[in-house]
């Protein structure tokens, strides 16, 4: 059992507060930067890939849902683009919010992974390590270095192309730990299939999952 002396506990609390403040600062600064850069006017690829797509689909060109955007098939992002125009007035606010929501989902996924990987530690060491790791991940994923992705309403596919394959592998790993986890395995397969609708690199998720399933069988 790990023993924490009063002085150590106090230092841990101070360090935790600092880590939480820094992580919060990164998020607040990112949101502030996004708000300052916001414009409802479509930018660059958005003219054809969001506004043009929405108008064409409404005119009956349903095949565009699966059409390539360069080498990618951005089916899931097109669903978000369609919702933005159909429900939220095409002002891109919904799309920007979704960028942050998807990143938050990635943080939650990494939090779950870190908890599982650190399960061998005893409390409070495990709890503190997971907390500091999560704060670091929040700051890392919301850093303004990737402002072009966070502040541009067209970029949800870049986040989804990382999140969904990672989710698929995580769920597949969970199913491998339990011989009776058929539903979990099906969910992993569905996530792998869905990954193909993010970007071109998402196509690799299913073949790699098959390889992992054979190894972990």
Spans of model-derived segments:
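Transmembrane-helix motifs of polytopic, lipid-linked glycan transferases
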Residues: 97-124, 167-171
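Perimembrane helix-loop-helix junctions
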Residues: 2-6, 204-217
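Membrane-interface alpha helices of multi-pass inner-membrane proteins
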Residues: 183-198, 205-210
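Membrane-interface transmembrane helices that cradle and orient dolichyl/undecaprenyl
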Residues: 160-184
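Transmembrane-helix signature of polytopic, membrane-embedded enzymes
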Residues: 114-143, 162-163
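Start-transfer (signal-anchor) and selected internal transmembrane alpha helices
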Residues: 1-30
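Membrane-proximal lumenal/periplasmic loop motifs of glycosylation machinery
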Residues: 37-42, 55-86, 91-101
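Helix-to-loop transition at the C-terminal end of transmembrane segments
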Residues: 29-49, 145-149
């Amino acid at each position: 059992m790990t023993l924490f002396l009063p002085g150590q506990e106090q230092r841990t609390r101070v360090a935790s507060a600092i880590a939480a403040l820094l992580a919060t600062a990164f998020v607040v600064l990112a949101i502030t930067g996004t708000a300052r850069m916001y414009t409802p006017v479509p930018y660059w690829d958005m003219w054809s890939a969001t506004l043009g797509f929405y108008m064409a689909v409404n005119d009956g060109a349903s095949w565009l849902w699966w059409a390539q955007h360069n080498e990618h098939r951005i089916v899931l992002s097109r669903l978000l683009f369609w919702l933005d125009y159909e429900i939220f007035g095409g002002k891109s606010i919904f799309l920007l919010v979704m960028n942050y929501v998807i990143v938050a989902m990635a943080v939650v996924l990494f939090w779950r992974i870190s908890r599982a990987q650190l399960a061998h530690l005893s409390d409070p060491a495990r709890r503190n390590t997971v907390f500091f790791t999560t704060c670091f991940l929040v700051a890392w994923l919301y850093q303004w270095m990737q402002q072009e992705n966070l502040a541009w309403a067209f970029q949800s596919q870049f986040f989804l192309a990382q999140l969904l394959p990672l989710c698929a592998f995580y769920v597949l790993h969970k199913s491998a730990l339990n011989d009776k986890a058929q539903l979990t395995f099906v969910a992993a397969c569905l996530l792998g299939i869905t990954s193909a609708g993010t970007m071109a690199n998402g196509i690799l998720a299913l073949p790699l999952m098959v390889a992992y399933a054979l190894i972990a069988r």
